[in-house]
Each structure stands twice: as structure tokens, then as C-alpha cells.
């Protein structure tokens, strides 16, 4: 997990550069979206974050009811390696840095670029499938693809990048909490 943590810490600034360049182009073409934070928005964000975490739990429970986890050597290996480190590294990595890095890449860059080429719905589906594929085993593919669809949808509906980031952090934290 320490290697993953360091890798994400190094990767985030690189992906952030691409995200910011794309964002500057979008702001120039479509105009800059103003950030307004109200109590209503805070409630909506809280409900959204809890909903994403609940979806993560639901998808994990559905997958657990099948024989996929036992049948997937790739998942077993990845899970053992992922949760083999110290708890502080697991928390910082899986609950904070990894969601930020993945959201920058998959919703911030991949989804936004696919949306320009394909439109909203195909971009949501394609970016979610790509997000699932990079998780490299069937169990995590299913979980990540479902979560990826929801996160891209939330990003599209709200227009604010922090919404899928907070949702992803909540989902990973809830899953991580189950392993601690």
C-alpha cells in the first residue's frame, strides 16, 4: 500500500495538469461555472455522499452473494496486497489519494473528453467501463463500473468535480472500514 500511496501522490499532479488544461478550454468555450455554496447545496452533497457509500455497500453485498469473490484469484490477490500494509497507509491511500487520482483521471479527463466525442450517456458508460477494466479482475470490474456510472452521472448533473470525488472517498472509506 505504501507503493500505491507514493505512486498516487506522484501521479495526482500530472493528472491534475491535464484536468486543469481541459478545464481551461471548457471555461473558455462554455464560460466559467460559478461556485456557490448554500445550505441547500450542503444538504444535497451530504445526501449524495451517503448515497454513493450506500450504493458501494449494496454492490459489494450483491457481489458477495455470488461465488465471484471465491472464484476470482485476481480479486483475492489484489485484496490481500491492497490490505497488507499499515492501517494508516490503507486509509490515506484507499480512502483519500486513490479516489482523488482516479476521479481526476476517469471523470476529470477521460469522461470529459469522451463526452465531447460521444455525448453524455455514451461517455458515462464508456468511462465507467474503462474505470472497471483498469481494476483488472471481474469482481472489482463490476463494482467499479457501477460506481463509475454513478460518479460520472453525478458529475454531469451537478457540474462540480468535488461531488464525485467526495462520493468516491465515501464509498472507499466505507469499504475500507469493513476491512479494518
Model-based region annotation:
Residues 101-126, 153-160:
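Membrane-interface helix/loop boundary segments of multi-pass membrane proteins
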Residues 100, 104-105, 109-110, 137, ...:
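Active-site His/Glu-centered metal-binding helix of metallohydrolases
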Residues 1-24, 43, 47:
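Alpha-helical transmembrane segments in multi-pass membrane proteins
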Residues 2, 42-50, 88, 92, ...:
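Hydrophobic alpha-helical transmembrane segments
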